[in-house]
Amino acid sequence: MVFYWATALYFVIVHGQRSKYSSVLVKNVLRNQIMYTPIYLIPFYFYPTPHSSWNAFWQLPGIVLLTDMIFYSTHRYFHHNKYLFTRVHKYHHTMDDPQYAPGALNAHPVEHIFVNLLSTVAPLFIVKANLYVSLVWTAAASVNVVVAHSATCENDAHELHHKYKAYNYGAGPLIFDRMFGSYKIENLKH
């Protein structure tokens, strides 16, 4: 949460980002983080893993690949399942301003669990990441989601997802979008 809000505040303070939905977006993001972060932490208590620099070396690329695969799959499913889109995922697209970084995790609680948290946490257990790798990954994922919703850097792919809704479902390298034909890029003028 610290890395998420530090990055989000950077875009609000330094870049002057504003949204007509800011109070609602911030409230929804805080609700999701406060309600579900403890659930996210429970498995780490019961599932300690050994610390090894060598393990960290191969775990991070595996985590990136698995996160992209899980996020792509669940996110695309939420788009293509009419019930899930209209009752759950549309919530993110309806009130979301893709250029307002603090609202990046504005999501229905069901989506937050099955898309956002699952894609961030499951890879850690699949590769048996140690606590340090898990903390680094969680911080990196938090910064990544905020930057993807900030209208800065090279996040046109995610902004196009919000514009067209049928492209760029993945997070990060968009490997699975490229593999399955849902990758779209065009230069957006900000």
Model-derived features: positions:
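Generic preference for well-ordered secondary structure
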Residues: 61, 97, 142, 159-163
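A cytosolic-side transmembrane-helix exit/cap motif
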Residues: 76-81, 152-162
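Hydrophobic transmembrane alpha-helices
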Residues: 104-159, 174-175
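Juxtamembrane transition segments at transmembrane-helix termini in multipass membrane proteins
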Residues: 161-171
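Non-catalytic, topology-defining segments of multipass membrane proteins
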Residues: 1-124, 170-173, 177-190
